[in-house]
Amino acid sequence: MDRIRIVGGNELHGVIPISGAKNAALPLMIASLLTDDTLTLENVPHLADVEQLIRILGNHGADISVNGRRERQGESYARTVHFTSRNIVSTTAPYELVSKMRASFWVIGPLLAREGRARVSLPGGCAIGTRPVDLFIEGLTALGASIEIDGGYVNATAPAGGLIGGRYTFPKVSVGATHVLMMAATLANGTTVLGNAAREPEVVDLAKCLNAMGAKISGQGTSTITIEGVRSLSGARHRVLPDRIETGTYAMAVAMAGGDVILEDTEASLLDTALEAIRRAGAEISDTNNGIRIVRNGAGIRPVDIVTDPFPGFPTDLQAQFMGLMTRSSGVSHITETIFENRFMHVQELARLGAKISLSGQTAKVEGVSRLKGAPVMATDLRASVSLVIAGLAAEGETMVSRVYHLDRGFERLEEKLTRCGAHVERVSD
């Protein structure tokens, strides 16, 4: 099993290309099930979760082709992937596939809308709290679906004439449920209005792609999304937006290690709140022609309190990384997690490096220390794993991170991108 070895102490200098967003690519790939035409996606990252979803879509009958594992585009790498779901051969998403990745549950929306039925296993993925599927079920029921859960599967059936447009207000903001209902509603009869919808850039990106396919969606980026159903969708060509979580992660890595790095092929507007927190921590951040420049030279890391919130608030997917940064601050910071329960599993591993963190409910109190010391640590989930890498960049000596398959789910060529900027990071095999 692979591990990541980090020898701390090196500043970061250079250019890091930002990949396409995993959290945007996954729903875009699933949207290909809505049409019998070809959907072409550019800037698709090469990640374990993407490869797993390709297998799942193939199970449903999608024909998938990749133009070049690495297509050189300036200083970045990207893939162009073509999806053609001319014939849906199965409306069942089995446990052995869905259990490996939560987002694969989202196929329930397109399958139900296009085929009138779906049988989808309850999901897997990162073990962060309960992450219930109640909102998906309630929302699809509001569109006329009949749903029952039996033997670990969600069995959904549309009315004889197809799904029916309706109104549904999410009791809490859910990005995944917003994706699913928006996709399902594109082929429903009549108009659907989603209230308290997620406003994340990935939702806006999905709506942009669906509209290019012939959908009639408005209000994306606000808390009320309106979808006027159409009879069918066509193919389209769409470029996946930059990964704001990867952008924020590398910005925090520079703030932690010190240095001067340009993050290319990304946009500051995708993560304003997170970048402001990094500025307050002591980094200088400025826009470039094609990205963002992060500088921290000499100045220490200042303590900053943050609370995770749905977009445009501080992203929960950057909470662990920011905690890693705060372990070296010059004071006390408080990090409150409001999106997911049980998302502090990285705390005890950071403590192995010398961090001083105490928990009280959904808030972590981080007392900055003057030095961290390398140690063997274990990744517990995707975002927690990269927080250990960030801490390792500033730790004295060697940090060895095990269970790095978590990293491979969401970070494309992480060790390569850090190494090209001067970090001592390498993948080793047992």
UniProtKB/Swiss-Prot annotation:
GO terms for cellular component: cytoplasm. It is found in: Cytoplasm. One of its GO terms (biological process) is regulation of cell shape. Keywords: Cell cycle, Cell division, Cell shape, Cell wall biogenesis/degradation, Cytoplasm, Peptidoglycan synthesis, Pyruvate, Transferase. It is an enzyme of class 2 (transferase). Phosphoenolpyruvate binds at residues 22-23. Belongs to the EPSP synthase family. MurA subfamily. PANTHER family: UDP-N-ACETYLGLUCOSAMINE 1-CARBOXYVINYLTRANSFERASE (PTHR43783:SF1). This is UDP-N-acetylglucosamine 1-carboxyvinyltransferase. The lineage of its organism: Bacteria, Pseudomonadati, Pseudomonadota, Alphaproteobacteria, Hyphomicrobiales. The gene is murA.
